[in-house]
Amino acid sequence: MAVKVAINGFGRIGRNVLRAIIESGRKDIEVVAINDLGPVETNAHLLRFDSVHGRFPAEVKTTETTIDVGRGPIEVSAIRNPAELPWKHIDVVMECTGIFTSKEACQAHLANGSSRVLISAPGKDADKTIVFGVNHDKLTKNDIVVSNASCTTNCLSPVAKVLNDAIGIQKGFMTTIHSYTGDQPTLDTMHKDLYRARAAALSMIPTSTGAAKAVGLVLPELNGKLDGVAIRVPTPNVSVVDLVFEAKRDTTVEEINGAIRDAAQGHLRGILGFTEHPNVSVDFNHDPHSSVFHMDQTKVMEGRMCRILSWYDNEWGFSNRMADTAVAMGKLI
C-alpha cells in the first residue's frame, strides 16, 4: 500500500517533491493533500511552468479546492495553523514551509492526527536527522519528527561516509559553492545576514552553513571533525561541495576515486553518482542524485592532504530524497 503524504508549503521544495514523485513513476507514495496560503490556480501555474526545471511533464487540472496531475484530485487548503488541518488520514506530513523546523513546532501536525512529520530542512531537536542512503536504516517506529537535513548535508554525507570507511578522515573543511535561493533578494534590501542582504544575481556572497557540522548528526563517527562555509553564486540552481580533508593514512587519487566508483555502482547506486567528463554546473540540473563526484578534480598532496569535488542539484536531488525518506518512515507505521 502506498504511503499517504501531505505537503505543507508548496514552494520550491514542495512543488519539486510532487514533481519528483510523478516523474519517477513510483507507486509507493501518494500525495493526497497540499496546504499553501497561495491561491490554487497560482500554485498550479507555478507547477506547470518552472524556470529551472521546465514544464511539468503532465497535464495539471484544477478546481477551487483540488489539483490533479493525473493520479486523481489532490485536496488543497490554505490554513495558516497546522493544528487545524484535516489530516487524520495522513501517514507523513512533508513540512516544506521553512517555518515549522523544530520538533516543538511540528507538534501542531501531530495534534491534527497526522502520524509522522518530515522536515525539509535541518530540524531543531528532531527525533532523527536522516540522509537517505547513509543512515535511513537507523529509522525506527519511535522516530516521529524527522529532519531530511539540508541539500548540502545530503551531498557531503555519502562522500564522507565512503571516504571515512575506506581511508579515514582525521578532519576536514568544506566549502559549498551554492546557487542563490529564495531567501536572497534580487536587489539589495534588509536581511539579518548582511551578506545575504545583497543582490543575489550580482555577486559571489560569502556566508555561513551548518551543513558540514550536521554530518555528525548523520555519521556520529565524524562528529566534530568537519566544518564549512558557503559562497552563494549568481546561478539559479546546482551547487558543488569542495572538501579538503586530512586522511588518517597515506592514500592516492586512484584509491579515493576507486572507493567512490565502487560505492556509486554498488550500495549507493542512485544516491551517489560520479562523472569522468569535463562537466560544469548546468550539466547537473535536474540530476536526481544526492551527490555526483567529479573524478578528475581529486587531488592528493604528500599522501594525506586530500581535496575532492562533488556536484548536486540542490533542489531536485533533495526533493527526490524527501520522497525516499517519507516512504521509509511510512513503512514503519
Regions found by a protein language model. Name each.
Residues 12, 16, 20, 108, ...:
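Alpha-helical scaffold segments in soluble metabolic enzymes
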Residues 97-98, 151, 207, 248, ...:
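Structured loop/turn residues at secondary-structure junctions
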Residues 40, 124, 212, 315-316:
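Alpha-helix N-cap/helix-start and coil->helix boundary motif
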Residues 285-333:
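NAD(P)-dependent Rossmann-like dehydrogenase/reductase catalytic/cofactor-binding core
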Residues 4-6, 145-147, 241-247, 306-312:
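Short glycine-rich or small-residue beta-strand-to-loop segments that form or flank ligand, phosphate
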Residues 154, 251, 316-317:
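A generic structural signal for alpha-helix starts
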Residues 23-86, 168-171, 176-306:
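C-terminal substrate-binding/catalytic lobe of Rossmann-fold NAD(P)-dependent oxidoreductases
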